[in-house]
Amino acid sequence: MRTRAYFSALVAGLLCAAASAQQIDAAQYQGLSWRHIGPFRGGRTVAAQGVPTQPNVFYIGVNNGGVWKTTDYGHTWKPIFDQQSTGSIGNLAVALSNPNTIYVGSGEALHRPDLSTGDGMYRSDDAGVSWKHLGLRDAQQINTILVDPKNDKRIFVAVLGHPYGANTERGVYRSNDGGEHFEKVLYQDEHTGAIGLAMHPTDSNIIYASLWAARQAPWENGAFSGTGSGLFKSSDGGNTWQQLKKGLPDKGLGRIAITVAPSSPDRLYAQVSAGAETGTYRSDDAGANWFKVNDEERVSGRPDDFAEIKVHPTNPDIVYVANVATQRSNDGGKSWTAIRGAPGGDDYHGLWINPLNPDIILNAS
């Protein structure tokens, strides 16, 4: 797998925003293409997010390279996390209600022989100028952070836990005070961690979470796969959970990536690792029933490494998947076209779509 960090932005339509009153023929921009905007080193870029109301501002997190920020659409980048005690990043999240609030979860969340761990959660209240360590120090691997879109102090964190041994600080955690205190709200056992989270776009009490039970030591490959993996739903803000099973594989479950269509929140998509049943799954009834829409290896291959799936903000049939190439579907996940990279290519791990301007897509490798 490549060690270079690629970070690409599709910025079709930005000139239209600059000339708001001028009528411009959209055909002029059909020739726009992806371009490499850096930074150039650091490892896998595992997290990428922008600020919807500030389309020139992006943040990325690198598995061994800390957190970086650009304020000029990616032309220049500045490291903003170098003074912290870890450089291993698992995820980051910018609060929609207050873009000065940024959360970082440290520790790349994978099961593989070679990775670096972190030391918990961090928060910045000044857009990355300064940071405060929040806790979850023994988590070691944090893969997903959700911030309530209306309350920047209410967050959910998916903790995978120790990569090479059992520990109890794993599962889904909730905080109502900006990470000053955490409460464990979904937990299976000391061998099973949380890997994925998704939130209903208008009802922040509806949350989806995926648990993953697996382990491999530095000298092994796929040494342990437990029975605790699964997909769960809470309708009361994380107080109680029910497992979603109907239509999903019941044997060999591994990593699951979950996403909600912002414009049609009963539409869910999942990238599911399950041996011969690995593939892209869809639900049209908020997770009650699932069906497989695609099982092509180019879309869902190596599912324990690649598990990033996102939906267009206004069209629930347009879906993006990050894999060795970034793929796009226009028909609800049935068929896919590579839009960046090539089979056997670049290893993409992060996607972000600006909800206010979906022509802006961050694609991180």
Language-model features: locations:
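Bacterial N-terminal signal peptides
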Residues: S8-A18
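Positively charged n-region of N-terminal signal peptides that target proteins for export
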Residues: M1-A5
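Beta-propeller blade termini and top-face loops
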Residues: A21-S365
